[in-house]
């Protein structure tokens, strides 16, 4: 009594399950990790990527590389996603997190082959993660964020793995000054918003050494009228987000005019309105008016007569930065302007021509809580890479200021945590001890990769590093990424923020757990009709190829 087979899934569906899926996920993760393995450490190689639009990206930043890569496998997509998460959360460690997650999955493969249930492996990984976090906190050391020399050293160890390391001193100074400028403390809570208030302006030309941090704001705008002043000391600044033009009616407004005088009256009302708006501004005797909207020719005429400089169509984000820098308040209506809305914190308003473009500088502010970083360089590609590196440096500085704890770099903290996990696994009983010990083994991938990227002997140096960590008081020993030899990170001054390390470990282990829990992939395919529909269009190419 054999009936017809019951089809539950559509014929266009493809289903993979069990062991095949798990090994597929692990291989995808390992492939992604292998792509950027050479991008770790001070001897990191750079990758050149061509984006779909034909633009070139040259970088060794893990997140920037993976962002440009097109992948199809769902596990590879989730690996790329964790790199982006790491970048948004702490701004650094994007390469480490991918390598570590790939290795965590790689060491789990042998247990799956031995028919160990994924739940057992996951349980061991969770235990190991808790112990890793506690161990990291134990070996971390507090740091005084007001010690400029030490802060520069910390940022330098982050920059050392980047292309910008040739100008490390300048970059460290820029990153530290920018973060200290935008740091705001309210109700005992520190807020450092680099994205909003530390703007990076890239201007091709000049040399990288010309880059600097402005104590104020720079905007790519010129004054609206040639007769307006282009250099003002101690300016009084008014910021608006309304236009100095006659208000057009809302959509499809109609006015019916029966007499000629009515038309003249309408024109007169427009002029009176603009005159009134300008009088509201002139009443406060400002030197500079900056608006996000337009300024009509008539309004410019009144402002020039009152010796007021005007800048129009400034971005909202730039306007917010100017407000923070000079202490002005952005007004939405001119008739509501008060004396306290005028910004008097800026020391200098100046228009400069750099290359072919005009830039407005509002600098020498008394207590700016916003700044602009001006980057100069030979080409757009170099500037883009320098900006990426600088963003990482600022994020590292921000992490240390908010959470002032450090752990040793150069693979020292990984080896230290791995040693403690290995010792703990000896006291465990049952099957879980093997995946638990495998986590310790996976952590060694960071120092191993550092040694490989130097071209040194991996086995010899890693073995001697393991032996070193069994001794008392050698927790800060790691790999000198420049020379590929053992060194004390404390003496070399290579430190990493605790926040970055914690996030790296958590993200890597949780991603490994997530991918190990997958045992089935169902993928929907395009309908057959769609493929047939496209074939006639492709058909004419066949004869050409035959020729």
UniProtKB/Swiss-Prot annotation:
SUPFAM superfamilies: GroEL apical domain-like, GroEL equatorial domain-like, GroEL-intermediate domain like
Main subcellular localisation: cytoplasm
One Pfam family linked to the record: Cpn60_TCP1
Domain of life according to the entry: Eukaryota
Residues annotated for ATP binding in this entry: 41, 93-95, 410, 481, 496
Family named by the database record: Belongs to the TCP-1 chaperonin family.
Role: Component of the chaperonin-containing T-complex (TRiC), a molecular chaperone complex that assists the folding of actin, tubulin and other proteins upon ATP hydrolysis.
Name by which UniProt lists this protein: T-complex protein 1 subunit gamma
Organism: Xenopus laevis
Organism ancestry: Eukaryota, Metazoa, Chordata, Craniata, Vertebrata
